[in-house]
UniProtKB/Swiss-Prot annotation:
Pfam families recorded: Oxidored_q4
Subunit structure and binding partners: NDH is composed of at least 16 different subunits, 5 of which are encoded in the nucleus.
GO biological process, any: photosynthesis, light reaction
Stretches of the chain forming a coiled coil according to its record: none
UniProt-listed InterPro entries: NAD(P)H_OxRDtase_bac/plastid, NADH_UbQ/plastoQ_OxRdtase_su3, NDAH_ubi_oxred_su3_sf
Organism: Nymphaea alba (White water-lily)
Alphabetical UniProt keywords: Chloroplast, Membrane, NAD, NADP, Plastid, Plastoquinone, Quinone, Thylakoid, Translocase, Transmembrane, Transmembrane helix, Transport
Key word DNA repair present: no
Protein name: NAD(P)H-quinone oxidoreductase subunit 3, chloroplastic
EC number: 7.1.1.-
Similarity comment: Belongs to the complex I subunit 3 family.
GO CC entries: chloroplast thylakoid membrane; NADH dehydrogenase complex
Amino acid sequence: MFLLYEYDIFWAFLMISSVIPILAFLISGVLAPISEGPEKLSSYESGIEPIGDAWIQFRIRYYMFALVFVVFDVETVFLYPWAVSFDILGVYVFIEALIFVLIPVVGSVYAWRKGALEWS
């Protein structure tokens, strides 16, 4: 027989964490003042009057470096719990973590050889 009452805390947390953002959006939509005008439609540049066009194009190189950074940053976050409990997990989990690290490394070597990470 399944003991579903063990998951009551999980379901309560899930419902509370779903209701709070919805309530926050609803309350801010009701209480926020509605103001329309040229000030609302202009772009914000650190409190000074905007100069020139706000829509400028960025090179795709910025996005490539940002994506590589995010991939390795998320990988580091996922590897931290493994590193904390490394001594009790065993060799099998070590091999899995090695494969987990190897996949982004192979991907970045591929991108490097294709010239996606060249800044010129």
